[in-house]
Amino acid sequence: VFPPDVNAVFDHGKRDVSSFPIATGTYYKQDYSAGVDISKYKNIPVPTSYMAIQSKFDFVGGYEEDVKGGLLHVADHHVSPGKKQWTWGNGDFGRAWDRNLTDEDGPYIELMTGMYTDNQPDFTWLQPYEEKSWKQYFMPYAEVGYVKNATKDALLNMEVKEGKGKVILYTTGVNKDVHVFVKDNVNGGTLFDLSLIHISEPTRLGMIS
């Protein structure tokens, strides 16, 4: 789950690049010219790394559709620009590693983040007596789908289908007097406006026409 402003990904050292989520060229020597959604594990036949191009969002994660749950990382993107996912791939080689690494759980995605770097081979200097510190949060979540924005306190998803939008809000604690509204920045006006007494679990907030 990369943020919605990620439209390209790189491999190690930025030697190769692909559009994202729909790949339209060659990436890791695989022909995706037909237009392939490489955000889906099932569509990646070989071991593949992809690191997100610069994003203004503070999160990255993964979501497993069959169990409707996932893992999310949240950190200030000015300090933690690195957002990476890696997989053995959904091919014979990848499935062989699945058998070696787990008894029953099957394939997995490695989620990696980078402080002060947006690509794995990069490094940063630490001067004598210099100290660098940061805060980051790893959290599980469920029943939300593909997150569109997140903080350490709340996760938000909005899906549009057949002209209607669905808003799903997930919080990491009990929140009182919650006010949720969606604005139309193109045509103006408010599409959705709802006040909640409290929220403490995944909540579907209704449809927006």
Model regions: which residues?
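Short amphipathic beta-strand/extended segments with alternating polar/hydrophobic composition
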Residues: 75, 193-195
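Surface beta-strand/loop "capping" patches
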Residues: 144-175
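A general sequence property marking short-to-moderate contiguous segments
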Residues: 132-147
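Active-site proximal loops enriched in glycine and acidic residues that flank catalytic Cys/His/Asp
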Residues: 113-115, 136-138, 169-171, 184
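Beta-strand-rich binding/interaction modules
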Residues: 165-193
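Acidic, contiguous internal or C-terminal segments within carbohydrate-active enzymes
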Residues: 1, 136, 158
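Single conserved hydrophobic/aromatic residue that forms the stacking wall/gate
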Residues: 197-208
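A contiguous, surface-exposed recognition patch within enzymatic or periplasmic domains that forms
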Residues: 2-131, 139
